[in-house]
Amino acid sequence: MVPQALLLVPLLGFSLCFGKFPIYTIPTKLGPWSPIDIHHLSCPNNLVVEDEGCTNLSGFSYMELKVGRISAIKVNGFTCTGVVTEAETYTNFVGYVTTTFKRKHFRPMPGCMYSRVQLEDGRSPQIEESLHNPYPDYHWLRTVRTTKESLIIISPSVTDLDPYDKSLHSRVFPGRKCSGITVSSTYCSTNHDYTVWMPEILRLGTSCDIFTNSRGKRASKGSKTCGFVDERGLYKSLKGACKLKLCGVPGLRLMDGTWVAMQTSNETKWCPPGQLVNLHDLHSDEIEHLVVEELVKKREECLDALESITTTKSVSFRRLSHLRKLVPGFGKAYTIFNKTLMEAEAHYKSVRTWNEIIPSKGCLRVGGGCHPHVNGVFFNGIILGPDGHVLIPEMQSSLLQQHIELLESSVIPLMHPLADPFTVFKDGDEIEDFVEVHLPDVHEQVSGVDLGLPNWGEYVLLSAGTLIALMLIIFLITCCKRVDRPESTQRSLRGTGRNVSVTSQSGKFIPSRESYKSGGETGL
C-alpha cells in the first residue's frame, strides 16, 4: 500500500504547483545521449524524497485537519441586555401616593455577565420576577425612586467561526460579522446598542474542533526539512509551502492545498490574503483510490514491460513509454537511435493539456522549442507518424485523465462560513424559554422634601407664602401696639394723681382723694 500511495501524492502534489492536475510529464532538459545495455533499463523511482536528496527519515508528530468535509464551525454563546426598571413614587399632603414606572437600558459589563452566568449555571432558564416592576417604597412629601438592574441573557446564541481570521458571523452582528474575540475584547457588539454577544468559552480555539494529531516520518537533509511521509504513507513536499493560521493555530499550507502544523527550521513566508486550504470528503477519498489503482496499474505495466524486455532481449517504442517518470523531477529518458538503445538525464515537468507539448503538426515542444527527431524517433516511445503528426502512446488511454478530472472537481476548499439566519432561533421557538434574568440588589433613592409642584408653581407658592408671612408679621405688630396703648394711659394717670384738685360748685377747694385720705386721717 505504501508504494501505491507514494505514486499518488507526488503526482498530485507537484502537479498542483502549477495549479492543475497533470496528464503527462515531459522533460524540460535533456542531457547528452549515451548508449546503454538492455540490462541498464529500470522503472523510474517516483519517490520525490530521493529527488530532493532528503534521504534521512525520522519519526515525528504533527497536526492535520480531520478527514471529512467541514461545512461550518459553530461557536456557542449568549446575548446579554442590560435593563433598568424604575418605579417613582410621590406622596402628597394627604398621603395620596402616585407611582410611575419606567424602563431603560444600559450596556452590561462583560465581567459582571460571566459572574452571573457562573452563579446561575445550575438553574433552568426562565423569565424571573425581576422583569416585573419593582415594589416601590414611599415617604410623605417626598419622591422615592426604586430601580432594579436586570441582565437578560438569551442562550444559546450560535455563531459561525471563520477559521482563517477567527472572525464570527451571525445576523446579530452589525454587518453580520464580528472581528473576533481577543484578550482585550471579550465580547462582540450587536445590532442593539445595549446588547452584547459573548462566547461561552473565551478561548475560541476550543470551539474549532477540526484538527487531529498524527504520526509520520520527517524527510530531511541536514537541518533542512524537505517534506514528510504522513500517517497514511503519503509523501508531502514542503516546496512552495506558506505559513497560514487556522483557528489561531500556526501551520503550513502545502502546494496541494493541504494544511499541517509541524515544527520546521525552514524560512517560510506567510500566505497571501485570501489563501484557502482544501478539504476532501469521503467521495474524494473514493476517487483517490481510483487514481491509486490506475497508477498502480501503470507501475505493474512498467514492471511487465521491463520483464518482457529482459526476457525477449528486444525493445520497442511502446515498451519504452512505460519507463517514463510519472512525477515532476529528475529522472531518465530512453530512446532508440539507429537500432541503438540510448539513455539521457532529464528533468520532467507536468503537462495539463496535449497542446502544451504539441503546439503544431510535427512539433514536440521540449524546453521552449521543437525537439529534433532522428529518423522520426524522439524519446520515451514518442515517434513521428507517417502523416507527420507526433504520436504519444499515452494519448491512447484516457482513463487516468477521467479519474483525475473527477478528483479535481471534488476538491473542496474550506470557505469562509456564512451565517445561517435559522441557527439562532428556529420558527416556533419561544425566546422566553431561553431567558435568564440575573438581578443585583434593589437600589432606592429618597429625595428631599418635595411639594410635587412644577417650577412655576413652586415660585407662586413661595411668593404666596412670603406674602402671607409678611401679612402675619404686620398683623402681629398691630396687635401688639393695641395691647400696649391702655397700659401706658393708666400709668400716666397714676403718675399725676397726687397733684390733682377738684373745685366744687360752692367754690370750696376739694383736694384729691389721696389728700382727702391723708387729711382725713390726720384730722381724725
UniProtKB/Swiss-Prot annotation:
Residues 1-19 form the signal peptide. It is found in: Virion membrane. Residues 488-524 are annotated as: Disordered. GO terms for cellular component: membrane; viral envelope; viral membrane; virion membrane. Glycans are attached at N56, N266, N338. Glycosylated and palmitoylated by host. Glycosylation is crucial for glycoprotein export at the cell surface. Keywords: Disulfide bond, Glycoprotein, Lipoprotein, Membrane, Palmitate, Signal, Transmembrane, Transmembrane helix, Viral envelope protein, Virion. The keyword Transmembrane applies. Homotrimer. Interacts with matrix protein. Interacts with host TRFC. Interacts with host BST2; this interaction inhibits viral budding by tethering new virions to the cell surface. Interacts with ITGB1. Interacts with host GRM2. Arg-352 is highly involved in rabies virus pathogenicity. Its mutation dramatically attenuates the virus. This is Glycoprotein. It comes from Rabies virus (strain China/DRV) (RABV).
